UniProtKB/Swiss-Prot annotation:
Its main location: membrane. Belongs to the MIP/aquaporin (TC 1.A.8) family. AQP11/AQP12 subfamily. One of its GO terms (molecular function) is channel activity. This is Putative aquaporin-12A. It catalyses: H2O(in) = H2O(out).
Length: 295
């Protein structure tokens, strides 16, 4: 129980410190530097850092849901995910320099989280931390299936995740935050036994790339190319094109928003009309004045 309390305290302390640093960065830095760099670095740190507590499987999914729920409320739209930054670039929502700065910030946050993780384990605040410190150099791989199957699993997870983000990108955080948190939790529960369901290249590189069992190229195929492929497919399905690269819609036909006015349909030949009261019916070719010999 003491180890659990230490882990939970570390989890919430890391989140609180990152939130304080984010607010200070927002107040002190220029708007562009905060939105592109500091915000992403803080979210990457807060996403990776708390897991140094080494939680058991009984708490992992619950804390994962709470973490993503808090992200959606507090972190101003930061993603801490390179594929989300690349999605914004393909959607023409972010420039190339801004995207590169976000990727650099995510890399910096990942390194800071790894440093925090090793420091926490060195303190040996609990038996779990001591065990992790001893096993740090001989960790086991998170990839517990074949490389093609793992790449397919990561691509499917990323596809569902990014398609949900695209559908909810204009929704209020009160709706999008819980929906994304629930999706990530369900995905982690379903695909976790195969690849740990990272679908985040920065998170995967931090947690499992240094572990034995697979080569670096195999890790790249599963945890980088898989999520990238799923993201591109999600954008294509949602938009029908990659807006930053193609103007023409590749999948869906363009509907003309200007419609020609439709004429009033002519009455059928068998239809009869009842004349209004006081009106006379005239036959075509005859005048309205009766001749003297008419009967």
């Amino acid at each position: 129980m003491a180890g659990l309390n230490v882990s939970l305290s570390f989890f919430f302390a890391t989140f609180a410190l990152c939130e304080a640093a984010r607010r200070a960065s927002k107040a002190l830095l220029p708007v562009g530097a905060y939105e592109v760099f500091a915000r992403e670095a803080m979210r990457t740190l807060v996403e990776l850092g708390p897991w140094a507590g080494d939680f058991g499987p009984d708490l992992l999914l619950t804390l994962l849901f709470l973490l993503f729920l808090a992200h959606g409320v507090t972190l101003d739209g930061a993603s801490a995910n390179p594929t989300v930054s690349l999605q914004e670039f393909l959607m023409a929502e972010q420039s190339l320099p801004g995207t590169l700065l976000k990727l650099a910030a995510q890399g910096l946050g990942m390194q800071a989280a790894c440093t925090l993780m090793r420091l926490c384990w060195a303190w040996e605040l609990s038996d779990l931390h001591l065990l992790q410190s001893l096993m740090a150099q001989s960790c086991s791989s998170a990839l517990r299936t074949s490389v093609p199957h793992g790449a397919l699993v990561e691509a499917a997870c990323a596809f569902c995740f990014h398609l949900t983000l695209l559908h909810l990108r204009h929704s209020p955080p009160a709706y999008s935050g819980p929906a994304v948190a629930l999706l990530v939790t369900v995905t982690a529960y379903t695909a976790g036994p195969f690849t740990s369901a990272f679908f985040n290249p920065a998170l995967a590189a931090s947690v499992t790339f240094a572990c034995s069992g697979h080569t670096l190229l195999e890790y790249v195929q599963v945890y980088w190319l898989g999520p990238l492929t799923g993201m591109v497919l999600a954008v294509l399905l949602h938009q029908g094109r990659l807006p930053h690269l193609f103007q023409r819609n590749l999948f869906y036909g363009q509907k003309n928003k200007y419609r020609a006015p439709r004429g009033k349909p002519a009455p059928a030949s068998g239809d009869t009309q009842t004349p209004a009261k006081g009106s006379s019916v005239r036959e075509p070719g005859r005048s309205g004045v009766e001749g003297p010999h008419s009967s």
